[in-house]
């Protein structure tokens, strides 16, 4: 069996290596072609070196092609696995830090809220370039498996405007299912679970064990759980008020809705600072900053570690390898993917990206009809979908009016800021992110003139209600070494 898979964003060592290892764990895939591409040649070469070492040690005769030329990597590829972060750490910092000046306190800022909307402008602009290359040089009908956030926006733009079949993938549903298994005391493989909604706002609308409906037991189970009751306060409150548990982590979910992060003095009531993902202000940004020199400090140590076994024993639960395996071998796989709705969830807009159960085999990807979401869940998702639609259309057409309307309609942004503040904030973010936003050339010129010449709304020297100190490189290294010793 021979075909080609291209990884873009392959300089992201841990995630790219995980996906690569998963794919090569399929015995039939030991003669396929693999190409890695990234804009950072040093990180790209390190990832190639490590993955090639794993191949050689397992006597698999694949030679990885690594190139900074995207089109060369995409040439004749049947599958493109995308895990890029457009703007890197520099762009990410502006997604979090500028909104804080206006009182918007985000934990992550990569999916919705002001940070996610602006991240979407950068990602969509570049991913449409990816799509052009895929159409021109990849195998006809090539599929892009997208891990980049904001996942729904990027997947929507690539399908509608990029004209490349794009499947959005996320692991939130997998983690939530593990939590439900623990709360119920039932092995995960014995649970029959259906999730439906939109990326990072998907709901466990059916949880059954031997035919018994387990959803009525979830609230009491989560409230009684010693760990989850402290770490998942937003998710539990949403479960209490909407009747269904959400797939997304506490910190992520808290910034997608209007209620939990709008008053600084109440934010700590809803979060937990034991782990950044539970709601820390700028938590993911802090961790990313702390790990920014990771390649230089840890790569030699990783090279000294035992090679990965490519026999399937270390295969993760990430969907990408199972999708490719099923399409190529005919084996069956069921997972929850992000796809164009087109009537799958009947009370969400036809033109939107939804996250739903899908079945994969040699005949393709089959998408069963979910029907209506519970009305309250649909209402939450619908508001986010309209933000996504405005943001997608803004990014594709460089329409600054739609961009600012997307920010106005965003639940948390609208709960904290008034329209003039939103207008000024978006102008400031456009100027700060100019290098990644070629579609906004004229709007950025106008924003610069406004910020330089017009009376400005005063902003705050505000660093968030739940911000932790960034650790030094030495502290990070010591903690990592301590974890290895403990393990």
Identify the function of each model-found stretch.
Residues 5-34:
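N-terminal Rossmann-like dinucleotide-binding module
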Residues 28-54:
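NAD(P)-binding Rossmann-fold cofactor-contacting core
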Residues 52-57, 82, 136, 156-166, ...:
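Short, surface-exposed basic-aromatic patches at helix termini and helix-loop junctions that form
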Residues 63-76:
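Short acidic low-complexity segments
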Residues 75, 81-82, 146:
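Redox-cofactor binding/interface segments in oxidoreductases and associated redox assembly factors
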Residues 90-160:
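Rossmann-fold NAD(P)-binding glycine/threonine-rich loop
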Residues 141-143, 147-213:
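Rossmann-fold dinucleotide-binding core
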Residues 185-486:
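Long, compositionally biased stretches enriched for glycine and/or charged residues
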């Amino acid at each position: 069996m021979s075909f080609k898979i291209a990884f873009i964003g392959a300089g992201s060592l841990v995630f790219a290596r995980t996906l690569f290892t998963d794919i090569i764990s399929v015995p039939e895939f030991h003669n396929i072609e693999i190409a890695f591409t990234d804009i950072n040649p040093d990180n790209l070469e390190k990832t190639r070196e490590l993955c090639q070492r794993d191949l050689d040690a397992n006597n698999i005769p694949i030679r990885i092609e690594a190139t900074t030329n995207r089109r060369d990597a995409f040439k004749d590829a049947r599958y493109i696995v995308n895990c890029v972060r457009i703007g890197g750490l520099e762009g990410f910092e502006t997604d979090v830090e500028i909104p804080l000046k206006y009182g918007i306190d985000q934990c992550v800022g990569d999916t919705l809220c002001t940070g996610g909307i602006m991240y979407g402008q950068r990602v969509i602009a570049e991913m449409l370039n990816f799509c052009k290359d895929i159409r021109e040089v990849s195998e006809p009908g090539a599929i892009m498996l997208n891990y980049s956030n904001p996942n729904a926006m990027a997947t929507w733009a690539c399908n509608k405007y990029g004209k490349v079949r794009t499947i959005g993938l996320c692991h939130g549903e997998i983690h939530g299912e593990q939590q439900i298994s623990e709360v119920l005391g039932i092995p995960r493989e014995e649970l029959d679970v259906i999730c439906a909604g939109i990326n990072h706002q998907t709901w466990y609308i059916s949880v059954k064990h031997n035919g018994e409906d387990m959803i009525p037991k979830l609230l009491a189970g989560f409230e009684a759980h010693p760990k989850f009751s402290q770490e998942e306060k937003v998710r539990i409150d949403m479960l209490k008020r909407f009747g269904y548990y959400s797939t997304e982590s506490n910190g992520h979910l808290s910034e997608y809705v209007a209620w939990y992060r709008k008053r600084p003095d109440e934010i700590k009531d809803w979060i937990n600072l034991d782990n950044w993902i539970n709601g820390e202000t700028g938590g993911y940004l802090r961790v990313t900053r702390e790990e920014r020199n990771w390649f230089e400090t840890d790569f030699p140590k990783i090279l000294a570690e035992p090679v990965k076994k490519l026999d399937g024993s270390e295969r993760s639960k990430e969907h990408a390898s199972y999708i490719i395996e099923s399409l190529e071998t005919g084996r069956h796989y069921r997972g929850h993917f992000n796809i164009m709705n087109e009537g799958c969830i009947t009370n969400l807009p036809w033109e939107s990206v939804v996250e739903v159960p899908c079945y994969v085999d040699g005949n393709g990807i089959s998408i069963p009809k979910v029907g209506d979401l519970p009305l309250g869940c649909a209402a939450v998702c619908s508001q986010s979908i309209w933000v996504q639609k405005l943001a997608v259309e803004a990014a594709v057409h460089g329409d600054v009016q739609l961009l600012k309307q997307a920010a106005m309609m965003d639940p948390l942004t609208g709960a904290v800021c008034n329209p003039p503040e939103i207008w000024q904030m978006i102008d400031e973010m456009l100027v700060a992110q100019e290098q990644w936003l070629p579609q906004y050339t004229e709007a950025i010129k106008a924003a610069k003139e406004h910020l330089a010449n017009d009376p400005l709304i005063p902003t705050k020297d505000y660093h968030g209600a739940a911000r932790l100190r960034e650790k030094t490189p030495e502290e990070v290294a010591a903690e990592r070494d301590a974890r290895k010793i403990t393990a």
